[in-house]
Amino acid sequence: MKIAVSACLLGDNCKYNGGNNYSEKVAEFVKGHDIIQVCPEIMGGLPTPREPAEIVNGIVKHKDGTSVDAEFRKGAELALNKVITEGVDLVILQSRSPSCGVYHIYDGTFSGTLIPGQGIFTKLLKENNIKVLDVSEL
């Protein structure tokens, strides 16, 4: 099986704060499979580290109101194209991210409050009938 994984889950230091979300569960789950790492935010041209971003009324913004929506959408499209081109069967995504959140995202107030919703990349994957899993489902 070919599996795409949020790069931060495999230890890539691509999170907004320069860190990662390495998951031993993910590393074990993907052993023996063909793996493709993706970080839509990096693919969209955003630096590491970078200001935190949340989806505010459908637009990805920094806390000061600066829009980074174009970068998030560009990265999501590029990551989707990579997933499709590579013939990926499953995508494992980081929880709560404005790119990769599967079930919940932050509410746009930068208060740490979660609401039901999906990240930009996750929406594109689902619209293209690509199977996704939140890391918490492993």
Model features per residue range: what roles?
Residues G11-G18:
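Short N-terminal binding/cap micro-motifs at the start of the first secondary-structure element
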Residues G87-I92, C100, I115, I120:
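Short, compact, well-ordered microdomains
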Residues Y22-I36, G75-L90:
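Short amphipathic alpha-helices and their capping/turn segments at secondary-structure boundaries
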Residues Q94-I105, T109:
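Internal, conserved structured core segments that host functional sites
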Residues N21-K61:
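Short, surface-exposed acidic-centric catalytic microdomains
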Residues M1-A4:
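Extreme N-terminal starter segment of soluble prokaryotic enzymes
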Residues C8, Q94-S97, E137:
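Short, well-ordered beta-to-alpha junction loops that form the rim of enzyme active sites
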Residues M43, A53-I55, I59-L78, K82, ...:
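Divalent-metal-activated hydrolytic enzyme cores
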